Amino acid sequence: MADIKNFLYAWCGKKKLTPNYEIRAAGNKNRQKFMCEVRIDGFNYIGMGNSTNKKDAQTNSARDFVNYLVRVGEMRSDEVPSLGAELGDSIDGASLKSEGFSGPTGGPLPPHLSLQAESSGAAPMRSNTGFNPPAYGGGAQWERGANLKDYYAKREEQEAQATLESEEVDLNAGLHGNWTLENAKARLNQFFQKEKTQGEYKYSQVGPDHNRSFIAEMTLYVKQLGRKIIAREHGSNKKLAAQSCALSIVRQLYHLSVIEPYSGLTKKKEGESVEPYQVNLNPDIVKQLQSTIQELGIELPYPPEDPSQPVSLNLGKLVHFEPSQKQSHSGVVPWSPPQENWNPWTSSNIDEGPLAFATQEQISLELKNEHMYHIQDPNIKQVLIDRESLPVKKFEEEIMHAVHNSPVVIIRGATGCGKTTQVPQYILDEYIRNDRAAQCNIVVTQPRRISAVSVAERVAFERGEEIGKSCGYSVRFESVLPRPHASMLFCTVGVLLRKLESGIRGISHVIVDEIHERDINTDFLLVVLRDVIQAFPEIRVILMSATIDTSMFCEYFFNCPIIEVFGRTFPVQEYYLEDCIQMTQFIPPPRDKKKKDKDEEGGDDEETNCNLVCGDDYGPETRRSMSQLSEKETPLELIEALLKYIETLNVPGAVLVFLPGWNLIYAMQKHLEMNPHFGSHSYCILPLHSQIPRDEQRKVFDPVPDGIIKVILSTNIAETSITINDVVYVIDSCKQKVKLFTSHNNMTNYATVWASKTNLEQRKGRAGRVRPGFCFHLCSKARFDKLETHLTPEIFRTPLHEVALSIKLLRLGGIGHFLSKAIEPPPLDAVIEAEHTLRELDALDSNDELTPLGRILAKLPIEPRLGKMMIIGCIFYVGDALCTISAATCFPEPFISEGRRLGYVHRNFAGNRFSDHVALLSVFQAWDDARMGGEDAETRFCEHKRLNMATLRMTWEAKVQLKDILVNAGFPEECLMNQVFNNTGPDNNLDVVISLLAFGVYPNVCYHKEKRKILTTEGRNALIHKSSVNCPFSNQDLKYPSPFFVFSEKIRTRAISAKGMTMVSPLQLLLFASKKVMSDGEFIHLDDWIKLSMAHEESACITALRAALEALVVEVTKEPEILSQLDPVNEKMLNMIRVISKPSTAGISLVMGNSRFGDGPRPPKMARFDSGFQGNRGRGYHGGYNSGGGFRGAGNRGFRGSRGGSGPRGGYQGGGFRGNYRGGNQGGGFRGGYQSQGGYQSQGGGGYGGNFQGRGGFRGGF
């Protein structure tokens, strides 16, 4: 094979082409590999190869490209030196047996009566396999997509028009021609009059009455463009929703050059004004500042001569990334069929062992012999009999015929029909029987981790194998990969998207399950696959969905065939709220008359309560009880009554209870456990949530002994993703939690909303697996009739920054162009905002290609601004803390609190920093210490401090993953070592963490007025969220040391509240949390609403420090290793930022005058000198990466331990020298790595164990 490179070169020479090879280092520091990509002009394919040396990597990439040229008919396989056989064509269908199964039942008899009248019948079957093969090479256009050429032609002109002003309801109006909520609707009406057309708003609503959101949607045909544009926006009332929808339409018309920019004066609603804040800097600090700026060679803006003509202090970018070559065409993710010497699951060539040299024929023969021997096992024969009883078995021949003849097939199957576990096995077994095993590798995506793992384990069981043979899984934090040939990988969509960077190489079939869920990752994957199918028609894509309308998917994929699989095993009878009340004779407990905070409720605009509507068929007691129940709340007592009623039926079977979120699951679990009836041994109550550990999740599948009732309390995770076989009863709250994000005001609305009719149908389908089932919907029939058919797809209600980065990382062309091909494209204004944000962060260069910074951000599974915050944290050697804070944003708070406000036990974790983020950091560090004493010590600590252990463990996993990605990107391990922070005394490292946090959460800045009241951007009113450590217990009027705070999210319920708050100094805002800084000579104006009374030159120097730091970020992301030896000028600049970050520099003392909420004494410090030579705890003096730990001083870098030498060396994973800054001196003790402990081994989780191979290597992805 050594001459394959020369062969390709000679072939290119004849065509006057040149192959271009690009080699880069890959892998981690323990096992260096090289990746080579080869491109040839005129071919939309990238040949890829990797190996432990550059020469073999080049050879492997050349061979991959030659294989591609053979597949597309550019050369013959017999011309190629030692090239393996190509894919064959035939798949023989298998004959199938048909069996009957039960059908639906009649009217709503109560279960105790319907049990006496059980019956079963046959359900009809039908299929639709008509398929019109498209012209796959023709790049078929999806008509919903936008034509963006006019927009991109105008890019530079729009950039010039963009303003940096920050408004409360329109933070980014300047980006969109200055069209705002106030002026857009009038302009849209003018457009309608001129065009003699009319757009109609279609309204829908989500959420219960007390927290309702309205959605306004409009589809408008634009004659000038010859196409439709769509907007879908939400607001707290119809008027606001319609205004937001009109704004989206007008902004899209502007970007498509149909209407002009707004030329009038933008009216700003006057918010409440913020008093100027006096800042006096120490003269010594002023001298240091001036000296630093002088050494950096930065020229400062002169003071204004006229206060009415303020000058900008923003210096812009001092250093730019060099623009990379603009991508000339829309890329397609490369695909190749399974080949010899290639492992698709690790995306690497097989350099060692027999598989490195075996041909496909040899591999196929060996696997067939093994398979034929295996199926003779009596246990396997019994499993085969069970598999044949599944409804999908009757459709095997039809499915295989469609898969063979069509690149795309949709399989629509009822819950529990067996499609998820059986279809991949049908395909694989067909290939094995036909001597083509080595030509088959199947990837199956699932929307959630639990489903990917549980389905993989089920399939492995059915095949009589250990997981990791023909079947494996890969989810975030954990992978068990299957063999390289004739195998199935079950993974989350996020994991597959991460793998796409290496292409879909060596995979014959992609199965996307649960396409109806419409999460943003699945929608993204469908666009990728649609393009891949057109470029490579040989690939096979199977889309699987529940029994919902799939016509949109069918149309999107070129009118592909749909196979409908019927057969819910047993019928399910459903009941509504009035039925449940009548059959249980339920009487609600007296309403809690405790008055709610008026500011929390924000008014009493109650809508119709459907619980007041009850049919005449029901008795007066039922109607009275129903009217006393509020639709706002989930009736836990009624669920309890239903469980007791179910017990009287004496029909064995598990009960699955659907609840909208973890808080209610926890509340319901505690409610039942406190009741002696349910707390006894006759009940087994199990929570099921995506955030609990997998070992806990697995328990829901385990059978229980006779006489015990299993009750599973679950979110919608159990709706479609997993099947629990013994469920007979479903109790459905009919609600779910969704996150609605509005970009123009940076507002997040976490709403518990009514689920859709489709959701309810899926939930009902979870019952009736082992016998006729029962479903109790806790909504009235009147409410059911009002439910939406489907919920809004996630792509319409989430920021697009992360998706945009993925598009650029995968080289798929322009962000807007790619997203316009989505099954339901997001509005153009949302796309432009994502692009603008990424350019502002320096993630995209002037050609809209990824910068080195953008490439790192694209690989971090975190919001891009937080990713950049972590990178700056590495520059200051506080990377670990910022990785912890970023990881914590992915999960709920770890605090368990029955009341709305946090208790003292939780508030104490914030020390005197007035910070939810510091509290999180302190909790995490205290837990990290406690768990070193073993699982019992960890459990005791969490129970004593009322913390959710599962959340803390997941945060640890996420933090380690983020740190691994940064280390793989080249950042020194020393800048990511654990540190101990002092939250009650001076700690300059903690000051820096808070400064960088202000950068990470910008533009979320607020000013404390009184009690719970705060002002956000432009002086708009909001409240401190009740879950904050800063939320007062009563009406006492607190004065914080600084009135300025930054916060993680703005939440809208009936009032707007700020969640995740941290107190900052005005200098930290000036340095990191302001976009527009203006000086009028007397005051410094931050983002047009905060006024600081400070000298012009001092503020200009501080603003210049940020520009200098941004310039350093450019250099560091090009070559992260330079952090080990920074030049003195940058060292001085970083030390100056450390000084500015100190609260005392701004004249702020962290000790409050009055006793803070009566917190009592702070908890005792955990001992720090407990780590040396502790073999029993699995830590000690050895470091995780053989890297020196050292410690860092408060002001200066300090010194680091010898790299790789002897003596006490800290570990990157485990902590290094965990010094504790107190008044300028280092205290504390050594804290070693986790090498021998290996993470959570005693909990069955494994760990990274000091290097990336500790648990199967770094698995890079979601």
UniProtKB/Swiss-Prot annotation:
Description of how the protein assembles with itself and partners: Component of the coding region determinant (CRD)-mediated complex. Identified in mRNP granule complexes containing untranslated mRNAs. Associates with the RISC complex. Associates with the SMN complex. Associates with polysomes.
Domain spans labelled Helicase ATP-binding: 400-566
Region (MTAD): 334-382
Any single Pfam family the record assigns to this protein: dsrm
Molecular function in Gene Ontology: 3'-5' DNA helicase activity; 3'-5' DNA/RNA helicase activity; 3'-5' RNA helicase activity; ATP binding; ATP hydrolysis activity; catalytic activity, acting on a nucleic acid; chromatin DNA binding; DNA binding
Motif (Nuclear localization signal (NLS1)): 588-597
Region (OB-fold): 960-1076
Alphabetical UniProt keywords: Activator, ATP-binding, Cytoplasm, Cytoskeleton, DNA replication, DNA-binding, Helicase, Hydrolase, Manganese, Metal-binding, mRNA processing, mRNA splicing, mRNA transport, Nucleotide-binding, Nucleus, Repeat, RNA-binding, RNA-mediated gene silencing, Transcription, Transcription regulation, Transcription termination, Translation regulation, Transport
Residue positions binding Mn(2+): T420, E514
InterPro entries xrefs: DEAD-box_helicase_OB_fold (IPR011709), DEAD/DEAH_box_helicase_dom (IPR011545), DHX9_DEXHc (IPR044447), DHX9_DSRM_1 (IPR044445), DHX9_DSRM_2 (IPR044446), DNA/RNA_helicase_DEAH_CS (IPR002464), dsRBD_dom (IPR014720), HA2_WH (IPR048333)
Ligand binding (ATP): G413, A414, T415, G416, C417, G418, K419, T420, T421
Protein's UniProt name: ATP-dependent RNA helicase A protein
Ranges for domain Helicase C-terminal: 638-811
Record domain DRBM: where: 3-71, 183-255
Encoding gene (name): dhx9
Chain segments carrying region Disordered: 94-141, 588-614, 1197-1262
Motif interval(s): DEIH box: 513-516
Region (Core helicase): 400-811
SMART domains documented for this protein: DEXDc, DSRM, HA2, HELICc
Region (RGG): 1152-1262
Lineage of source species: Eukaryota, Metazoa, Chordata, Craniata, Vertebrata
Chief site of localization: nucleus
Role description: Multifunctional ATP-dependent nucleic acid helicase that unwinds DNA and RNA in a 3' to 5' direction and that plays important roles in many processes, such as DNA replication, transcriptional activation, post-transcriptional RNA regulation, mRNA translation and RNA-mediated gene silencing. Requires a 3'-single-stranded tail as entry site for acid nuclei unwinding activities as well as the binding and hydrolyzing of any of the four ribo- or deoxyribo-nucleotide triphosphates (NTPs). Binds to DNA, RNA and small interfering siRNA.
